[in-house]
Amino acid sequence: MSSLTYLKKYELPPLPYNLDALEPYISKEIIDVHYNGHHRGYVNGANSFVDRVNKILKGEISSGQYDIQGLLRGLVFNINGHKLHSLYWQNMAPAGKGGGKPGGVIGDLIEKQYGSFEKFKALFTEAANSLPGTGWTVLYYEVENGNLQIMTFENHFQNHIAELPILLILDEFEHAYYLQYKNKRADYVNNWWNLVNWDFADKKLQQYMKK
């Protein structure tokens, strides 16, 4: 009989560029606070809940000494926060290396499904600007039927939301833009298009298409 390994902990991935690499569209100050503060906080939060779950599995905490719904909710929230932020960083490229119109397979699929990149961009932007409160706007690939789907969701409490085949992801929590854009979230959304890493999105799409 194999020995139990219990839940493994999460690690903060390295930022794929320097803190100032996304300027002038996203400031160094925002990236520093966002990555070293908020993202690190999700990793630490997830690991704190992992420790508690492992203590339950080991019998160190007995039934009645914890709130299982609160425990699972906190675990999912922090894991999703960590995984979605990891995608968000990779989904952007330094100023001058990102943005523009997509090529490759993703460019062809966008043209085929939406008619033009301009129509897709307008629809994604409209979805992002219509998001109430805080959350995310994403483009994901439906493996079952090959569709590209635009979706918004508030916060990140949803179970396994981070496991969707996400190709593009836009963080719309205030910590992603407020230090620079204040209450002008639409300006942040518009400028984010200058940073989109289409090469990364295209590689992700091709990976999902093989499944």
Curated annotation (Swiss-Prot):
GO-annotated molecular function: metal ion binding; superoxide dismutase activity
EC code(s) of this entry: 1.15.1.1
Superkingdom per UniProt: Archaea
Keywords on record: Iron, Metal-binding, Oxidoreductase
Class of this enzyme: oxidoreductase
UniProt cross-references to InterPro entries, sorted A to Z: Fe/Mn_Superoxide_Dismutase, Mn/Fe_SOD, Mn/Fe_SOD_BS, Mn/Fe_SOD_C, Mn/Fe_SOD_N, Mn/Fe_SOD_N_sf, SOD_C_sf
Binding site for Fe cation: 34, 85, 171, 175
Cofactor: Fe cation
Keyword match Nucleus: no
Catalytic activity: 2 superoxide + 2 H(+) = H2O2 + O2
Cofactor note: Binds 1 Fe cation per subunit.
Similarity comment text for this entry: Belongs to the iron/manganese superoxide dismutase family.
Function comment: Destroys superoxide anion radicals which are normally produced within the cells and which are toxic to biological systems.
Name of the protein in its database record: Superoxide dismutase [Fe]
Species whose genome carries this gene: Acidianus ambivalens
Lineage: Archaea, Thermoproteota, Thermoprotei, Sulfolobales, Sulfolobaceae
Gene responsible for this protein: sod
